[in-house]
């Protein structure tokens, strides 16, 4: 049993290789991150369960801890943050995204400032939000960056289906987000 006490608590179970048939309960608010370097195998023998608030209340309005499970290693969250939290990386809306390497349709500095205010009591300006964010522990940063990642995947799917949109039939935006968080090569250009 893992007990989170605060909405910003992030409990982690990390294995360099495999996690097999883990039976884990998490009580309270916050997050549980389960990450396997290779395989996360649960089948019908393992479970990851959020039990909710231990006193029966819903202090955050969202109930118990969220659970994030990943296998195959961690994403490159630092590179993802550099791309999606810097307004200098915003693409020219009049040009095709595929022709603008290193650019993205949307950057999330406004959403970052709002999230910091809501989750961490941040009172600074939007311009100072990135420095505040960079000083947070990596597990706290990942909570926000996963939200950005899923927002980009959702937007990419919607753009694909918008026949009147600039990227109709193209999942470029979603593929770009996936490639940034989970690159195919390491920093030296070797395949991962």
Residue ranges and their predicted role:
Residues 1-192:
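Low-complexity, glycine- and small/polar-enriched segments
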